[in-house]
A protein has these predicted regions:
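Short, basic/aromatic-rich helical patch in the C-terminal catalytic core of site-specific tyrosine
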Residues: 30, 140-142
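Gram-negative outer-membrane beta-barrel transporters
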Residues: 18-121, 195
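Residues that define the transmembrane beta-barrel architecture of outer-membrane proteins
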Residues: 24-26, 84-88, 134-138, 184-188
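Extended hydrophobic-aromatic, low-complexity segments
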Residues: 4-7, 44, 100-105, 120-124, ...
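Short, surface-exposed loop/helix-turn segments at secondary-structure junctions
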Residues: 124-131
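C-terminal beta-signal and adjacent terminal beta-strands/loops
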Residues: 115-123, 144-196
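Solvent-exposed loop segments that connect transmembrane elements
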Residues: 3-16, 54-77, 124, 166-181
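Outer-membrane beta-barrel transmembrane strand signature
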Residues: 15-16, 109-110, 125, 139
Length: 196
């Protein structure tokens, strides 16, 4: 398992590659879908994942221990970064056969889907300041689709404009402060496609 980490020396902006000697990731996923003829379909999935370092003796110190007497820490047994215990998605689509510009094999459709994930660590060495709370997102799309010929649809990602973090990370210089990568705000778009 490889993790990009920061040095503990103040003023050094460069990271280094550190190898955790042994990690373990266990999980299970359930998924299902159902279609009612050609007009309605739903799907869903949920997963449970547990990941932890079995042995990582030379890990960087967490953010709150930066500047202390130790440059490295044994975090064996701690959880792995970026892994939510629970995550999943659910969605559905309603579609009706339709003609569009002479095409008779297409459908008008409206589809919605949502995803969620629970809280997770954003740091290679677990830190109480670098945990990201769980969140859910909703997406919507509607339009006309066809296996051949012209298709178009309008869409929105993060329809409810949920504020969330994708990542929290120690800022440059290792002075104990941190920065964030913000998740995308609500966006809208139009997709045009032509299949031969």
């Amino acid at each position: 398992y490889k993790a990009q980490v920061q040095t503990a020396e103040v003023g050094v902006n460069r990271g280094y590659l550190s190898n955790a000697e042994k990690v373990r990731v266990l999980g299970v996923e359930f998924e299902g879908s159902y279609s009612f003829k050609e007009y309605f379909s739903i799907y869903g999935n949920v997963s449970y994942t547990d990941g932890k370092y079995l042995k990582f003796t030379n890990a960087p110190v967490p953010l709150e221990e930066t500047g202390g007497e130790k440059a490295f820490k044994d975090i064996s047994g701690a959880r792995l970064p970026g892994i939510s215990k629970w995550s999943g998605a659910v969605g559905g689509e309603v579609a009706f056969p339709a003609k569009f510009f002479g095409q008779s094999n297409g459908k008008y459709f409206v589809a919605v889907d949502g995803t969620f994930r629970t809280e997770f660590s954003s740091s290679s060495s677990p830190s109480k300041y670098l945990n990201i709370g769980g969140y859910g997102l909703m997406n919507l799309r509607a339009g006309y689709k066809s296996p051949k010929g012209f298709s178009f649809y309008v869409w929105s990602r993060n329809l409810l404009n949920k504020n969330y973090f994708e990542q929290l990370l120690p800022a440059a210089g290792n002075a104990g402060h941190y920065a964030a990568v913000l998740g995308d705000q609500r966006t809208f778009g139009l997709t045009l496609r032509y299949n031969y």
